[in-house]
Amino acid sequence: RNNEPIIIKNDEFRKCILFISFPIYDYKEEELKILKDVIFDRSEKYDTKRKLAIACINNYCLSYRSKISFIGNNAFLEFALIYPSVASLKKDVLQDNLLFAREMIFNPYLENGVFSEKLVRESIEMYKEGVKNKLKRYDGYCQYKNDLLIDENDYLVSKVFKDLSLLSNVTSERLYNVYKKIISGPPLTFLIGNVDEKKSKELVKEIILDNKISNVKFETDYNVYVKNISNSVEVVRENSEFSTSSVCCNYKVRDMCCYRDRVLLTIVKNLLSSNNSDVLF
């Protein structure tokens, strides 16, 4: 498909959500894990946490984030930004927030022409601590072992999570080269909320896409999520130092290969459990 901005108008929303997603065609997972944190930490213009916080207030930016999304066999570097709608704020701040997003995405904070080595090291240590803390909790450990049981191709459990030593390969220079390669391609853009569709599309094209419309190629294959069906029941028991016990059950879904099935599975999951982190297979 081409990267023409997609505007989804909904008058009931009091907030507007902007998504900017860059397809990633060639990557090392350990680099992406750190890249998403380094990019939105600060920028060339907002080179301190204080300046960034003030910019958010001035632009009425309610929240922003960057993350890596994996959909089928595709990876995306995704940026999301939320701001009040015209109806709730009595003021249109779309242009201000688009300019803010452009600054954060295309003008990252650099030192000596590459990402800050200090920020990269901090992000690596934060990721390591997050992994260690998850495995210290009985529920996190149980989910990890559960995913390992059914995950043959690293779709549920990342290679980095299983082997933190991979992060030693990440350097500020390599990370910056990866970043430049990713953002050199056309992004997919979505704007959802109570907006003026025509005006919004023109602003997104001008500020984010630089009026360049081109094709974006990616594949959809949901079969990668599903392990081959087994006719036998496999039971795994493990003793640990946790004082609390935890039980995980996996149910395989046959022939889940389209988006519709994934939506229905999410609904069934929420009906059967109050915990939105539970996944049925």
Predicted regions and their residues:
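An aromatic/glycine/proline-enriched structural segment found at the starts
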Residues: 1, 150-161, 165-166, 181-256
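N- or domain-start disorder-to-order transition segments that initiate the globular core
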Residues: 1-16
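M16 family metallopeptidases and their MPP-like homologs
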Residues: 13-32, 37, 49-103, 132, ...
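Extracytoplasmic/secreted envelope proteins and their assembly/folding machinery
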Residues: 32, 49, 53-56, 98, ...
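Catalytic Zn2+-binding segment of zinc metalloproteases
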Residues: 38-46
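Acidic/histidine-enriched alpha-helical segments
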Residues: 49-54, 100, 107-132, 216-227
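A conserved active-site cap/scaffold subdomain adjacent to cofactor or substrate pockets
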Residues: 244, 254-257, 261-274
